[in-house]
Each structure stands twice: as structure tokens, then as C-alpha cells.
């Protein structure tokens, strides 16, 4: 079995790559993909923690290992909503500005 530390290191590397892309890239699509990468890094950490510290079965019919999976499900729902709204905003910005560069997009002037 792979130790928890390896999963957390991989999650931290993915999250750091997402933060670096978010801070240094200028294309809105790339920034959007970096945000999704950060959310997936958090999902990996949730699954790793849930698998490592699952808890004990108390007879209630709920598997304690599923707690991390439930959090991941909610994060995926939020990510899907964020993707829908984000892509709609990106399309609207591209139609009005004809660019996806965040330096050239100034929403205060037409």
C-alpha cells in the first residue's frame, strides 16, 4: 500500500502547479484550467485522508471510508457549476473584447 505521504506530496505538487499557473499565465482559459487543477489536488488529498483515516464502522450502515468520497462529490459539483459559469463568462468576454488575454481585458471601458 502506498503511504499517505506520497499522496499528499503529489497533491501539493499539483496544487502548486495550479497556483503557479494561476499567478503567471495571462490567458483566461489557462487560468481557468489551473483553478480546476487546484480543485483536483484537493480532491486527491480528500481521498487520501479518507482512505488512511477511515474510522471505525459503528453499525449505522454508513461506511466510514466514504466520508472523503462524499466531500469529493461535493467539490466536483461545485467545480461543475464553476465550469459552467466560468465558461459562460469567458465566452461573453471573448465576444465583446475579441481577446482572452487578461491584460487586455478591461471591463470598465468598452
Task: Report the location of each language-model feature.
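Alpha-helical transmembrane segments of multi-pass membrane proteins predominantly involved
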Residues: 1-110
Amino acid at each position: 500500500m502506498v503511504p499517505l505521504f506520497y499522496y499528499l506530496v503529489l497533491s501539493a505538487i499539483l496544487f502548486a502547479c495550479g497556483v503557479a499557473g494561476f499567478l503567471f499565465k495571462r490567458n483566461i482559459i489557462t487560468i481557468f484550467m489551473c483553478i480546476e487543477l487546484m480543485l483536483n489536488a484537493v480532491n486527491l488529498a480528500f481521498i487520501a485522508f479518507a482512505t488512511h483515516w477511515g474510522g471505525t464502522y459503528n453499525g449505522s450502515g454508513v461506511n466510514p471510508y466514504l466520508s472523503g468520497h462524499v466531500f469529493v462529490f461535493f467539490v466536483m459539483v461545485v467545480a461543475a457549476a464553476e465550469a459552467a459559469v466560468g465558461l459562460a463568462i469567458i465566452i461573453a468576454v471573448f465576444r465583446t473584447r475579441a481577446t482572452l488575454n487578461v491584460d487586455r481585458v478591461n471591463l470598465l471601458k468598452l
